[in-house]
């Protein structure tokens, strides 16, 4: 499947999120406007790239993009709003943080946040649209770095290994050590644990 860009639109921002599934930390989003005169080779869905390749591409994106920005919604906001609404809010923040206002926004997935700019959702857009691929890489690198920092503060939880996702290791550590302030209270494994304490 080949994506057809909107006709006659110059500044297109791609938007993606990372971190809807984890039990801990923020959902992180990115918005990127690429420079058509400085193409970046190797852009793809961040999940299909090695960590080393993601880091290299993230630096290249930051150097070559016309504009890029990050957005986020914290664990508390996720608990208050729910993960879908918090993700939409984080995407909106990423677009609003861009130093250049895009003419059109392409969003990975099947929903678009409320924006003052025309937008379109593209299912599996992170593998089809270069701008969304770039956004997915920046968001993934940023969130992974946050998990590495959390791992330094709380090495016993092994965040560097599972990145906050509900793996068997994370669930075992959660049961053994209890949740941190950064854990999402509204997510079932954390909620169940809090109800038994």
Swiss-Prot record:
EC number(s) recorded for this UniProt protein: 3.1.26.4
Catalytic activity: Endonucleolytic cleavage to 5'-phosphomonoester
Gene3D superfamilies hit by this protein: Ribonuclease H-like superfamily/Ribonuclease H
Enzyme class: hydrolase
Gene Ontology biological process terms, A to Z: DNA replication, removal of RNA primer; mismatch repair
One Gene Ontology term, aspect cellular component: ribonuclease H2 complex
Signal peptide from the UniProt entry: none
HAMAP family: RNase_HII_B
Name the UniProt record assigns to this protein: Ribonuclease HII
Gene behind this protein: rnhB
